[in-house]
Amino acid sequence: PNHKVSDFLVPYTSSGCSAMCLYCYLVCNYNKCSYLRLFVNREQMLDKLMKTANRSPGDLTFEIGSNSDLLLENSISGNLEWTIENFAGSKKGFITFPTKFDMVEALLPLNHGGRTIMRMSVNPQPIIQRLEFGTSSLTGRIRALQQMHAAGYKVGILIAPVVLLDNWQELYSQLIEQLADELPDKLKKELFIEIIFMTYSYIHRAINAEAFPNAVKLYDKSLMTGRGRGKYCYRSDIRLQAEEYLKELLEQKLNGIPVIYIV
C-alpha cells in the first residue's frame, strides 16, 4: 500500500533504467549501473491488476512505474502502449507512472479511456544537466506533459527530487516561473503537484565516486543527517525552510494547483 497518488505500488514489466541519475535508488539495487531488465509475463500482471481493480468497491490507483521509467522502456518493448489500451477496458481503477522522458508520441493516439495518469518529473534544467544524465530536457518534458493532456490523459507534475545545491533557491524559482509561463491555463486547472526531497546514501556516494568522479557531490554534511541504515536526508530545519520557500513560490506563481503531498 502507498496512499500518496496511488493505493498500491506494484512491480510491473521492467526494473532498472538506462538513464544515470546520480541520486536514483535503482543504481544501488545493481551495485554500479542500473541496467534495464524486462519481464515477459505482462499478461499475468495486468490480469491481476484488473481483477483487483474490478473487485474493489471504489476506484483503486496502481503505481506501475516505481521500479523503472516505463516511457523509456516503451521505446524498446511497446509494453506501456499495450498496457494503456488494455487497462482502458477495465470497469474501475487507474494506472499511473512517473517519467523523466518526452517520447510520448506513441501514446497520444491510444484509446486510454481516462484510466491512465502520467506524472512528469521535473527539475531545473541545470540540475537535469548535472544530475539526471541521459534523460530528456525540461523543455521536452513540459512539451510532453502538454501533449498528453491534450490527448485526454490525466496528468500531474512531480517536483523530484528537490536537491539543495548552493543556488537552489534561484534554480527552483526559475523552474516554477517556467512552468507558470509555459503551461496552458486549462492544463493548470486539472493538474496536481507532488514534491519529494532527495534521499541519498553512502552506497550512492561510493558508486558515484567511482563511476562519475567529476560529477557534483550530493552529500553535504552541513545540510544532511543520518536516516535509517546508511541513508542521508536533509536536516529537519533545512528541509522546513525549503518546503516553505517552495510552497510560497507555488502559491505566487501557480496559485490554485493542489500540492497533494511533500515528503
What are these regions, as identified by a protein language model?
Residues 12-21:
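Cysteine-centered iron-sulfur cluster-binding motifs in ferredoxin-type domains/subunits
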Residues 141-204, 254:
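Conserved C-terminal portion of the radical SAM core fold
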Residues 73, 116, 133, 137, ...:
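Residues lining hydrophobic/aromatic ligand-binding pockets adjacent to catalytic sites
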Residues 1-7, 22-119, 147:
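Conserved Radical SAM active-site core
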Residues 42-48, 77-83, 135-144, 171-181, ...:
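Well-ordered, non-membrane alpha-helical segments in soluble/globular domains
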